[in-house]
Amino acid sequence: MGFPRDSYAESGLNREAVQDAWSAVANAISDYEPVRMLCHPEDLTAAQHRLSESIDLIPVTLNDAWLRDIGPTFVVEDDALVAIDWQFNGWGQNTEFGWDDDDAIARQIAEILAVPAERMDIVNEGGGIHVDGRGTVLLTDTVQLDPTRNPRHDRDSIAAHIHNALGTDRAIWLSKGLWRDNFLNGTKGHVDIVACFAPDGRLLVHRQTSKDHPDFALWDDLAQQFSDEGLEVLPLEAPLTLKDHLDWVDYSYINHYVCNGAVICPRFDDPRDDAARERLEDAYPGRDIRMLDAKALFAMGGGIHCITQQQPSGVG
C-alpha cells in the first residue's frame, strides 16, 4: 500500500480524513497478513501515528497512493516471481497531482523485494485489468484504448501485450466503466469497480438498480455480454445511495480486497450492506467478510481494491 500525501480538492475531505481512511484498510489487512506501506519521508510521523506497529513502513518518494495502479503486477515465470512494470501516466494525464514519481514505484518495489522487473511498452494500471487465473482477462475500451494512454494501439495490439505480460489467452472487452469514473480525477473506466472473478470462476458484476442513475443500463449490457462469453454472472447490487455532495456516486462492493483468510469489503452505511456481505460470503466461502466504511475512499475516486496490491508469498 501507499500512504496518501493529501486529499483531492473536490473530495470534500481534509488530509487527515484521507490518511485515516487508508490507515483503517491497512490495519484491517494486517490482522490477516503482513502489510508494507510506502510512505513519503515527510509523512512518516503521520503514518506512524495511525498504523499498527506490525506494518512495515518504507520511505519512498511518491506522488499519490493508488498502489493497485502504480505498483507492480506480480506474475510467475519459470517458477520465479516477476514484477510487471506498466507505464503509468496519471490515468491518461487525468490527475491534479504529478505522476513522475509514481511511474517509478513498480520498479522500486521490485528492487526492494529483489525480484526482476519487466517494463511494459504500454500504459496500463492494475485497476484496469482483472483475471480469473484460467486465462481470461477483463479490459475496457476507454482505458487501454484511451488516446491519452495508448494512442498508437488497437484492441489486438493491446491484447497481445497484455497476454504476453500476464500469460492470459482470452480478452473480454467492456465498452466502458461506471459514470463517475469519468469525473474529474477518475480513471476513465477501470474494470475493478465493475466486475471481478470469484475463486470458482463465477463473475461478480456491479448492478445499479435505480433507473435514475446513469449506470442503470450498464448491467443489462454486461450481463448479456458475459453470458454470451459463457460466464456465470452473480449480480452485486449497488447501494441505494445515489448521490454525494458532487453528483451521482459509483459506490460499489466489487472493489474489495481478498487477503489470507478474509475479504476486506466496502461498507457505505447503506441498507444494501448486509446483502453485499451475504453475496460475498457465497462467493468466498470460508473467509471472513470484513466491511469497512469506504465513503472517504470513494470520495477520493476509488475503493479498497484500488489502494492495495497483493504480493505473493515467499517474496521479500
Which residues does each PLM region occupy?
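The feature marks the mature, well-folded catalytic cores of soluble enzymes
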Residues: 2-316
